[in-house]
Amino acid sequence: MKLAKHWIAAGALLLASGWSALAQTISSPKGGLQLHFALTNEGVPTYRLSFANGEEIIRQSRLGLEMTDGKKSFDKDLEVTATKESTFDETWTPVWGEVKQIRNHYNELLVELKKKSNGDPIAIRFRLFDDGLGFRYEFPGGKDRNFYVVKRELSEFAMTGDHKAHWIPGDYDTEEYDYQHSRLSEIRGLFDKAFTENCSQKAFSKTGVQTPLMLKTDKGVYINLHEAALIDFP
C-alpha cells in the first residue's frame, strides 16, 4: 500500500510526566527545544515538547490512530521495535515568497512500533526544528501488509494554560468567517455567534476550529498548530 503520511506542525512547543522506561529525547539543532517520546505502561504512544530549561509549552499528549476495525487501531498495546536518529540540513530557493532562500534544518527521531496482539507495524517520524516540531504517522508498505481505514486521529496537543486563541469555526466546507479572539475556555460559549450555518456549511463540534490555530501564552510565547501533506488521509 502507499505510504500514508500526516504531518502536524507546531511552532515553538513542549510537555511532562507519566512516562514509561522506554523514553527517547532529541534536541533541536541549536539545542533550544527538546522533544520527548515514550510509551505508557499500557503501550500508548505519547510525546511532549519543552524548552531546554524544562519549561513546558505542550504537556504530555497521546498519539495514535483509531481504525474502523477496532482490532487494527494503533491506540494502545504497542511496543517499540526500533528507533533511529538523524540530522538534515539544506537551503532551497522558493519560486515565490517573502524570502529568497529557506533553510530546512532539523534533527529527526524515527520510532518504529508494532501492535503486540497482531504484529501490525506503524512508525512515527518526528522532526524538530529550532522554531518548532513536525510529526507524521507512516504505514510501512509491502504486499503482505493489511489495508487500513482511518476512523479518527487521536493526536493531542495538551496546552499548559488557558491561552489566548485567534480562531474561526471549523467545518469541512469553507473558511469564510470573521476571526474571533478569546481564551480557549471561551470558544464553546462564543461558537454559535461566530458560526453562520447555511447549505454549504455544517459544524462538526461546538469547540471545533480551523487550522492554522494561533495561540499566545501569558508569557508571550506564540504557538501555531497546523497540518500538511494529508496523503491518503480522510
Whereabouts are the PLM-identified features?
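N-terminal secretory signal peptides that target proteins for export/translocation
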Residues: 1-4
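Bacterial N-terminal signal peptides
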Residues: 9-18
